[in-house]
Regions:
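Sec-dependent bacterial lipoprotein signal peptides
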Residues: 1-17
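Extracellular glycan-modifying ectodomains
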Residues: 14, 19-373
Length: 373
């Protein structure tokens, strides 16, 4: 892929700031004081060839931001609470971002001629759904689009799934939860459409291939992290799409025990903070979904953090086998690396699916790097 990168000012500013080791938990960032900010005046552009097309979807309607003049805004640690919605701060960390780049490039090299590798960095809600009138007043966070552009611009031999502009064009829709850090199924569906367009062989239809279910009363990570702030006491609804071809998933748990489970589980009676676990049984080292309507040997592997949970069900109609690997926990059950997993299972598509906060967490990227060999 031929690329043009106007990044001297970006890297210069990054190096002057220094490389922070500010860490996050498994998913959410909690330290915003020492991480590196991507300067707002930096420019990173890319050009794509036919062999490495970056799929995009154009907005079909003009999107306007709501009037936020009377909406209360409160900063609470690493969270910004705006009305009844919380947003997570993100800060770019150069050293960790560069290791992510190296890791993804190595995955492409290891699987060259054997499988297609896709990189998917998922932005968080702050730079997507937070109205510009509020977002523009926040100076101690990084520009997620520029951070993603920086990482994608240095990835070669891997297909990059562009999500930022697409999600931004749908920002007035219910694509992120209000009181949890994850995206919703609708946000994940728009990501699936981008992947399918890039792959050139996706055919799933939301109306024909899935059954919609809803589970009310979800109070997620932001609600808990805010010490149950009253402003967030407005539960989300978890909307899920159950594949019509099968709702069965075979899971290997972290203790090595197998579990027959559902791709979409009825969580109506589950605890309020557990309802995101409707998707693929939550976070497990290894899972396999077999589509009984396919007999062509097609197989994909999704290497994911928890954002991949809501995305995975949309892959099911397109493949005979969908293999799900959580890179944070896989080594608990196996010492196999990426090349061995792909060879053993005749996998032809590999999706590396991470939310952007993971790309600033050295522990998570170390785990991803350890596997991608």
């Amino acid at each position: 892929m031929k690329q043009k990168i106007i990044a001297a000012s970006l890297l210069g500013a990054l190096m002057l700031t220094g490389c922070s080791t500010a860490e996050t938990t498994l998913e959410s960032s909690s330290d915003t004081t020492q991480a590196i900010l991507v300067p707002s005046d930096s420019v990173v552009t890319t050009e794509s060839s036919e062999s490495e097309t970056e799929a995009t979807t154009e907005a079909t309607t003009e999107i306007t931001d709501p009037d936020m003049s009377d909406v209360p805004v409160e900063q609470l640690g690493a969270l910004l609470i705006v009305g009844d919605t919380a947003y997570e701060y993100y800060n770019f960390v150069l050293k960790t971002a560069d290791k992510y780049i190296t890791t993804v490039n190595r995955a492409g090299e290891v699987l060259k001629g054997k499988a297609d590798v896709y990189a998917m960095i998922i932005p968080t809600s702050m730079d997507i759904t937070l109205p510009a009138s509020v977002r523009d007043t926040i100076t101690n966070v990084s520009d997620q689009k520029k951070a993603i552009d920086y990482m994608y611009s240095s990835i070669n031999g891997v297909k990059k799934i562009e999500l930022f502009d697409v999600l931004k064009s749908h920002r007035n829709e219910y694509i992120y939860y209000r009181n949890d850090h994850h995206w919703t199924s609708l946000g994940a569906w728009y990501a699936y459409q981008q992947f399918a367009a890039l792959r050139g062989n996706g055919s799933a239809s939301l109306e024909n291939d899935f059954t919609k279910v809803e589970y009310d009363g979800f109070r997620g990570t932001f609600y808990n992290d805010s010490q149950k702030n009253p402003a967030l006491n407005n539960p989300d609804t978890v909307v899920a799409y159950k594949p019509n071809c099968t709702n069965h998933i075979d899971i290997i748990q972290a203790n090595g025990e197998p579990l027959d489970w559902s791709i979409i589980t009825n969580v109506s009676d589950w605890r309020a903070d557990s309802k995101y676990n409707t998707f693929i049984g939550g976070d497990n080292p290894w899972s396999v979904i077999k589509n009984p309507n396919k007999n062509d040997g097609s197989a994909c592997l999704i290497i994911k953090d928890s954002f991949g949970n809501a995305f995975t069900p949309f892959l099911v109609p397109d493949y005979q086998y969908v293999y799900v690997l959580d890179f944070r926990y896989y080594k608990k059950i196996s010492s196999d690396k990426l090349s061995a997993v792909v060879a053993k299972n005749n996998i032809k598509d590999v999706i590396i699916c991470t939310n952007i906060s993971a790309t600033r967490n050295s522990g998570l990227i170390d785990a991803l790097s350890e596997f991608c060999q």
